[in-house]
A protein has these predicted regions:
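"…centered on the first transmembrane helix and the immediately adjacent amphipathic helix/loop
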Residues: 1-54, 67
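Terminal transmembrane helix and immediately flanking juxtamembrane interfaces
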Residues: 1-21, 93, 97-115
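Membrane-helix interface segments
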Residues: 2-8, 59-66, 88-92
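Small-polar-interrupted transmembrane alpha-helices in polytopic inner-membrane proteins
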Residues: 10-21, 66-83, 99
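Short helix-capping/hinge motifs at transmembrane helix termini and TM-loop junctions
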Residues: 23-24, 57, 86, 113
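Interfacial helix-loop-helix junctions of multi-pass membrane proteins
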Residues: 32-36, 77-99
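Membrane interface segments of multi-pass transport proteins and intramembrane proteases
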Residues: 33-34, 60-61, 113
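Membrane-interfacial alpha-helical segments at the cytosolic side of multi-pass membrane proteins
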Residues: 44-58, 102-113
Length: 115
């Protein structure tokens, strides 16, 4: 796939993240999986990091310096918006898990591209 396709996937995925984050807490099914909240954040943003890196024209350390702040700001925006949703709250720990996920995903793509 070319970077334009990944740009479309990235935007669609970001909309999906914001859509899920906008759901009131009582709308989520009660499952054991939701107790793994930080792991879910990490995986969610790991995918975001991969899509963000692949959506760029070139993959380089310079690209990484764009993707990482982008991922962090998107995580902060996501948490901020959650603070307005019934039964949801913002968490710095969630932002940290988001940033770790973006970093791992982006570094994975950078490492694979450099080989």
């Amino acid at each position: 796939m070319n970077h334009k396709t990944f740009q479309i996937l990235l935007v669609a995925y970001m909309i999906l993240i914001l859509g899920l984050s906008s759901m009131p807490a009582q709308d989520f099914p009660k499952t054991w999986l939701l107790t793994w909240d930080k792991l879910i954040h990490l995986v969610e943003y790991f995918i975001l990091g991969i899509l963000a890196m692949k959506s760029m024209n070139t993959i380089s350390y310079r690209t990484l310096r764009i993707v990482l702040p982008f991922g962090m700001l998107f995580g902060v925006l996501d948490e901020y918006l959650q603070s307005f949703i019934s039964g949801r709250f913002s968490s710095g720990w969630d932002v940290l898990a988001d940033m770790i996920g973006v970093t791992i995903g982006a570094l994975l793509i950078l490492g694979n591209d450099k080989e």
